[in-house]
């Protein structure tokens, strides 16, 4: 991907609203997808995107280790918007092998185990989800982590060979919750119990 193109898109969208950023990509590109963990930020983006395009692609990764509340919010989202979020699962044989070699919670035992688990449960399904995608929309915010402070609105993701868009990059947590309350967006009840994402 041409760095100059990404820089030009960032300049063009610099002072645009989140809705305008999303509209830009939905209208200028064919294969646009939101990856949703069903966390608050992703629910905001789901609402914004589906208000613009009821047929937009939204997917999630079911690692096999999700809380029941996550399935509840997925169901509530599907019902509210009349959609079906695409769900990508890990390869069952690889998960079974992971269990046989590391046990149920082997990912807690070492960094190598954690990386292996993450690769099987998250990275491989994400690769399948992004296979034909041109633009990957995420719910990442700069305020979530020091590693995200300098993250641009639009970037090229070399690992997945896709344009990655972070429309909420400058949002604060209060902005997310204001939007959810104002627009009656379904959210994961784990947030009420102190879970950040």
Q: Can you say where each PLM-predicted feature lies in the sequence?
A:
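Nucleotide-activated chemistry modules centered on ATP-dependent adenylation/adenylyltransferase
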Residues: 1-197
